[in-house]
Amino acid sequence: MSSFQRLNIVRKTGFVAGVATLAMIAVSFSGGPLVAASCRTDAMAGIDWRECNKRLLMLGGSNLDSAMLYGTDFTYTDLRGSSLKGANLEKAKLIRTALGEANLQGANLTKVEAYRSDFSAADATNAKFVNAEMQRTKFENTKLDGTDFTKAELGRADFEGATLNGSKFSLTNLSRARFGGAKLGGPVDFTSAFLLLTRIEGVDLSAATGLDQKQIDIACGDAKTKLPNGLTAPASWPCPEDPDDD
């Protein structure tokens, strides 16, 4: 073999190796197999499970603090008692997900899909549920101090017994949601919230902000409901029970 032929082989080998390297880099940036490999990694603090399929799993008690869970699918998954402090769950799917007694302090749940999920007795202090889809979701006895539900869809959500100090429900759909026994010890913002048949029987709303008479007129309270100064109970109170309350 001549020196010229050997030189051509070296050049071709180097070119192929370079192409392979570039292909690996392209795959990693495009979210291909290199990124997908992290989906098989066990739960741990700071894990990157973005857009992974985590449906129908038993992950109760997991430590997912500060985890990257953007777009992750947790449909029907059990995350009860798990810690997700500071986790990024933006656009995650939490449909019928069990999150009872989970720690979600400071977590980002912006634009999550969480129909019929259960956050009962969880701690979601200072969490963000902005623009979230959470119809019929349970927040019974949940800590929601400083939690932001701005523009969220919370029709028929259950906030019975929840702690809501300084929470935000601005522009939120709360139609037929239930707040019986909820504790609103701080200024809760209901500016432009939709309160059609929202159950506020016995709730102390005296420190709430952003409420107007039109909102109160379509809500459901009773003689024990405390309203902010200047607002009065409509003659339609109390409302009959909702036949579709399940």
Region annotations inferred by a language model:
Residues S3-A20:
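Bacterial N-terminal signal peptides that target proteins for export
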Residues F4-Q5, V27, T137:
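Absolute N-terminal positional cue centered near the fourth residue
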Residues L7, R11, M24-I25, C39, ...:
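Exposed boundary/loop context
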Residues A20-F29:
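Hydrophobic core
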Residues S30-D246:
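Tandem repeat scaffolds
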